[in-house]
Design a protein with these regions (language model features):
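A short, well-structured beta->alpha microelement
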Residues: 79-101
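Bacterial signal peptide processing site
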Residues: 32-34
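N-terminal secretory signal peptides that target proteins for export/translocation
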Residues: 1-10
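Structural recognition of alpha->loop->beta junctions
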Residues: 156-187
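C-terminal motif of bacterial Sec signal peptides marking the signal peptidase cleavage site
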Residues: 27-30
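Ser/Thr/Gly-rich flexible loops in soluble cytosolic domains mediating phosphotransfer, phosphorylation
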Residues: 126-160, 204-213
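A short, gly/pro- and small-residue-rich
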Residues: 116-140, 189-196
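Short, charged N-terminal beta->alpha structural module
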Residues: 56-82
């Protein structure tokens, strides 16, 4: 009699443990599916993805910005004006209608509310320009490269709106390490199966552009 009761008790305990394990598995799975616990794989993002070497060679290239920040101006002074020899179009306010088919567009993302105000552009206007660009990427076979080079200073609720849109729809994401302090930039890339490349300072974009143009030093 005692042996039978003990056996039944053990069965009940085993069943409870099994139910708890199943509950934990279901709970953790649902968290990952809903994006509540985004995970970034153990990967060295400071390594340039080799498959993108030569991506922009012999292509029409555009450099533009989303959010009206001055980060793209810094890039132009430090990199474009000194090291880039191929032809390109630099237009901070370019629209999708002005971008040729089968081209490459570098999009520097980061919001400056002050700059938006000075240019007479509202956040809604800039979001509309962003959406129009994204919606036509496939139609016009445009390759978009997302860049965030303003570091932590170009992060925040307003900037993040633009970052999420660009970094979720580009072909390659490039960013400075300080802007990824919370792993948002790598997480957006991983969740959308987009390769990304992490640099320390914007001056490293000199070599990055060379690699994209198929030039190795």
């Amino acid at each position: 009699m005692n042996i039978r009761k003990t056996s039944n008790l053990n069965k009940c305990l085993n069943l409870i443990v099994l139910i708890l394990l199943l509950f934990n598995i279901i709970f953790l799975t649902s968290c990952n599916e809903n994006g509540n616990t985004p995970l970034t794989p153990d990967y060295d993002y400071s390594l340039f993805p080799e498959e993108y070497e030569g991506l922009i060679k012999n292509k029409q290239v555009y450099f533009t910005s989303i959010g009206q920040s001055t980060d793209i101006d810094t890039f132009k002074i430090l990199v474009l004006d000194n090291f880039v020899s191929f032809n390109y179009i630099f237009d901070k306010d370019i629209t999708i209608n002005e971008i040729q088919e089968n081209s490459i567009v570098f999009v520097f993302v980061g919001c400056s509310v002050k700059a938006l105000g000075e240019s007479g552009t509202s956040i809604e206007d800039e979001l509309n320009r962003t959406n129009n660009l994204i919606n036509q990427l496939k139609t016009k076979n445009i390759t978009m490269i997302g860049l965030h080079t303003g570091g932590q200073a170009r992060r925040g609720s307003t900037s993040n709106q633009f970052i999420e849109k660009i970094f979720s729809n580009s072909s390659l994401n490039i960013f400075v390490e300080s802007g990824n302090f919370d792993n948002m930039l790598t997480t957006l890339s991983v969740e959308n199966n987009i390769k990304c490349y992490q640099i320390i300072t914007v001056t490293e974009l000199n070599n990055t552009i060379k690699l994209l143009n198929g030039v190795k030093e």
